[in-house]
Regions:
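N-terminal leader/linker segments that initiate helical-solenoid repeat arrays
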Residues: 12-90, 106
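Short inter-helical turns and helix N-cap capping residues of alpha-solenoid HEAT/ARM repeat scaffolds
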Residues: 42-43, 71-73, 103-104, 132-133, ...
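Conserved hydrophobic register position within alpha-solenoid helical repeats
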Residues: 50, 78-80, 111, 140, ...
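Core register positions within helices of long alpha-helical scaffolds
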Residues: 53-56, 82-86, 114, 143, ...
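Solenoidal tandem-repeat scaffolds enriched in leucines and small polar residues
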Residues: 166-177, 195-208, 226-232, 239, ...
Length: 430
């Protein structure tokens, strides 16, 4: 770890920085070379973490450097910021292109990511996509996808038929990232490729186009022997927003693989498939996987059917607190609910702050006068958001019995709660 950090500090301070962020160019060749060398010598896990986060949330926006250690080198932020910019240095571009064939997969990926976000010409990318080396073709396809380079679309479509799986599958992924409907025909053909990985990438990419006319190409994949393919197909179908896939996705709720069931639940929520309500309610209460249960609760909230109140209330007693939280949150979304279940009232006193918060917000949303005391009790909660929800809920009831609780809230330590209490009292006394 110390060795890794040593290399990274050497990279970050190479070719220093310090100009305002809006004037900083992309990284030059010295900085790019130092970064790639550092990553080549560090722990593979660290390299992969940096590759994932490269360019994300790195821009320095606090000249005062608050929250930074006082002895931290000031140049490091500038070095990081330069890598969020577009590389334009011709020598850096040459180095990045030359690194696309390196043996180190992580370094290769970082180089491709930087190249994709750079000023590299379409002609150079197309040349790399046709390189004799499958490794370079795959890396170039990744670069084209990262940069969403529409000017490489035809070359990527051609690459879908590559005899090597890596470049062909990466071309499918890149076309999905580019989102150009003109690629549909090539992707429709590729879902029938002999390589499972190419079929997977192509099905995913068709989903990214969000066009219901491609349902016929992806729907059969819900019966594929590979659970990853079935899950990807379910996700893609959800994005296509076709009313013709509801029954097939409901059928996928009984898939033996948890990832497929989760994807089917999410897709049904995206489609607002109301015919799935009963099946989702059953899965919420009976599935062996808590993540599937949580997705079911969220989906039922999206579908908003009043009949889901009873199963969601039962889910408040689930052994998994995250399922309880999701159920409490979903209840607030249901339509035409006027009577709060006892389980929801009990959840407002939970020791878990998030569950208590979700339950209080749902209770306030329902506005059942029988729960007035439960909301009044939450006016003294230690959590500001809970107090605020309770005050707003009491105000919406517009009944004199809420006045004592709202009057107490006028002395709350938080000004937002005090303002809400004053407004709620105004409504109550109208």
């Amino acid at each position: 770890m110390i060795r890794a950090m040593h290399f990274l500090v050497l990279w970050a301070t190479a070719a220093g920085g310090g100009s305002p962020e809006w004037e900083r160019p992309g990284a030059d060749s010295a900085r790019v070379a130092a970064l790639l060398a550092a990553l080549a010598h560090t722990d593979p896990v660290i390299c992969d973490l940096i590759g994932d986060q490269l360019g994300n949330f790195w821009m320095g926006d606090d000249p005062a450097r608050l929250g930074r250690f006082s002895d931290a080198p000031t140049r490091i932020q500038g070095a990081k910021d330069s890598l969020a910019g577009s590389v334009t240095d011709p020598r850096a571009l040459t180095l990045l292109a030359a690194t696309l064939g390196t043996d180190n997969a992580c370094v290769r990926r970082v180089a491709a990511k930087l190249l994709g976000r750079s000023a590299v010409s379409a002609a150079v990318l197309r040349e790399l996509l046709a390189d004799p080396s499958p490794r370079i073709r795959e890396s170039a396809a990744f670069a084209a996808g990262v940069g969403e380079r529409r000017d490489t679309r035809a070359a990527l479509e051609h690459l879908l038929a590559d005899t090597a799986t890596g470049p062909a599958a990466m071309a499918g992924w890149a076309l999905g990232e580019i989102h150009d409907p003109a690629s549909a025909q090539a992707l429709q053909g590729a879902v029938h490729a002999s390589s499972p990985r190419v079929r997977l990438a192509s099905a995913w990419a068709l989903g990214q186009l969000e066009d219901a006319s491609f349902v016929k190409d992806v729907l059969p994949l819900l019966r594929d022997p590979d659970p990853l393919m079935r899950a990807t197909a379910a996700e893609a179908l959800g994005r296509m927003k076709s009313p013709r896939v509801g029954a097939a996705l409901v059928g996928a709720l009984s898939d033996r693989n948890t990832a497929v069931r989760r994807a089917a639940v999410s897709a049904l929520a995206d489609l607002h498939e109301r015919s799935a309500v009963a099946a989702l309610e059953g899965l919420l209460l009976n599935d062996s996987d808590s993540e599937v249960q949580r997705e079911c609760a969220r989906a039922l909230g999206e579908l908003r059917a009043a009949r889901s109140l009873e199963p969601l209330a039962r889910a408040l007693g689930d052994r998994d607190v995250e399922v309880q939280r999701a159920a409490a949150d979903a209840i607030a979304e249901l339509e035409d609910v006027t009577k709060a279940p006892a389980a929801l009232v009990r959840a407002t006193t939970s020791p878990d702050p998030e569950l208590r918060r979700n339950a209080t917000k749902s209770l306030a949303r329902i506005g059942d006068p029988a729960t007035l005391q439960a909301l009044a009790d939450r006016v003294g909660d230690e959590d500001k958001d809970i107090r605020l929800a309770a005050v707003e809920g009491l105000g919406e009831m517009k009944i004199p019995a809420a006045i004592p609780g709202l009057t107490r809230a006028l002395n709350d330590r938080d000004p937002e709660v005090r303002r809400a209490a004053a407004e709620a009292l105004g409504k109550t006394q109208e």
